[in-house]
Amino acid sequence: MDRFITVAAIVVPIFAAIALGILARRKLWVTAENVQGFQSFVMKIGLPCAIFNSCLTAQIGAESVSSMALAFPTVLLGALWAFRFGRRKFPYHNLPQLFCAQESGMLGIPLYMLLFGADQAYRMGILDLTQSVVAIPVIAILSSDTGENPTPSQVVKKVMTSPLMIMSLLGLTLNLSGAKNWMQGMGVLGIVTETTGFLSQPISALMLFSVGYNFSLAKGSRKHIFQIAALHFGAFAVFALMIQGALFLIPGVDALTRWAIFLYCMLPGSYLAPSLGRSEEDFTMASGVCSILTVVSLAIFCVMASVVA
């Protein structure tokens, strides 16, 4: 009974936030603009603060380098497959974005924080930084020559100057350079971490509410949506097994790193994919795939929580 209560304490708030998002859309409690405001707060303030805090205070060891080295070829292979073979069967312009990046920013980091605490968020943040090496060129390619859309250089500049990227790199720089120790000696570190920690508190609830609000599954293209979702899940499940096997060969890798890799592979494809489409069909496909994979990843997270709790 105690184990059930422990798991329920993690899982019930997740589905409560999602259910409230669905209900809010049906009852018109909030508008799409309101939800975009929630997401903007998360991506520009809350999440960068959480990642900065985690990267600043983390004891980053060899396991972080191992995670980066193993995650990079995973998303690279996904992107190459989507460009070379995937679009032959599924002729959607934005298909590669679903396979070159997992939604570790909006969903992965908040879920990982729920389970292991904000101080461990850097483990997922490291993976988010790693995939950006592949995702940024893909975004540039998909967004090029689209009329009113930004040029590739503008998109790359926007990603590289995003609050999440800046705060991640700033936290890592202060940590690895030794500036963190100076801040601690001056008594500043505690003030900084308490402030950023306070600002990051609402991010999990806001993002899960947004997931429920934006859930959609169009009827016209359900066959392709389910096929692509199944393909994505199967591919990253195989990647997860391969990476876990490789981690057993590396000494000193702890359980939290393994869980971060596992959760990362079980996440949906990037929520940015719908916005990179060139047609209504592209948008519908990407939105549907993201919706299905979000439900699947949350179900897996519940199982994961029952094991870890």
Segments (PLM) and residue ranges:
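Alpha-helical transmembrane segments of multi-pass small-molecule/ion transporters
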Residues: 1-309
